[in-house]
Amino acid sequence: MYPVDLHVHTIASTHAYSTLQDYIAEAKQKGIKLIAITDHGPDMVDSPHEYYFINMRIWPRIINGIGVLRGIEANIKNINGDIDYTNKFTKLDLVIAGFHETVFPPQDVKTHTTAMIATMAQGQVHIISHPGNPNYPVDISAIATAAARYQVALELNNSSFTHSRVGSEPNCRAIVAAVRDANGWLSLGSDSHISWSLGNFHHCQRILQEESFPIDRILNVSPQRVLSFLQQKNKCIIPEFNNF
């Protein structure tokens, strides 16, 4: 089991079903130490208002012994790599970004690859969400090389093997192998939209084992590894986690 989940949605994304408190209780029960709340960016049709992200500053850093990162799953908007993460949100700890049909309709490999690399190059994003989505094929080798260059983790998303983005597994396998060969970072995300799936990386673990991916390049191994990654990426130091 990994003690960190870096992709979680609450009822603020209205197609999800659990509250922050629900996730804290579930994390406590499962022995998860650190979670990132990453509700959908404001360009999604049922996303929270921008005030929701701004007001995350009132959240305690540690709740009942569980560390909470303030995050967003932003939307890649165009081929220039722009995302719906504005200067108003700059106090967030973790920025995930990915393609979603209602914001960036699927196009072709070249367009998707160019947009994803441009997003990474802008320097705001820590993790690219579900890059194995078959609706958005990319040049996997180029994406993995760029991710390593820009210190961006590529996500292995457990829900891509179950009910979302059907047909993702071949791409996800290729991404894991490409990140391994590029000496990049992988992030595991449950992409939970209900608390019961928090920390469920069952399918991710199977792929990691079968592709012989090194554990020292997986962010979720410990809270300390995630916090160190954030600090190295953009000098994000969270004093409340100094002794966490």
Swiss-Prot record:
Keywords attached to this entry: Hydrolase, Metal-binding, Zinc
Amino-acid positions noted as binding Zn(2+) 1 in the UniProt annotation, renumbered to this chain: 7, 9, 73, 191
Gene3D superfamilies assigned: Metal-dependent hydrolases
GO terms classed as biological process: bacterial-type flagellum-dependent swarming motility
Residues that, per the record, bind Zn(2+) 3: 73, 100, 130
Pfam families reported in the protein's UniProt record: PHP
Family: Belongs to the PHP family.
Protein name: Probable phosphatase BCI_0316
